[in-house]
């Protein structure tokens, strides 16, 4: 599956510890190799938001938007702060 990331996501990623960055890179590779949603580990849809998903990476959550063809990776934050700002209102 194809994906794009936002400038905010890349900026947040650079602020994370190195071991978490490596795990997130592995998740991004998993998304590229996936042929269906079921192939992407730890991905769940957000309740009440049809096109928004999250992926768990230890204590962090990645926010994704599915436009029908591609994923847009919009956000990454700690679990506690992630749900305060994602999905965008």
Model-derived features with residue positions:
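Residues that recognize and position ribonucleotide moieties
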Residues: 2-3, 53-55
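Conserved short hydrophobic interaction patches
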Residues: 27-30, 79
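Enriched for short, Lys/Arg-rich terminal
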Residues: 40, 57-61, 65-89
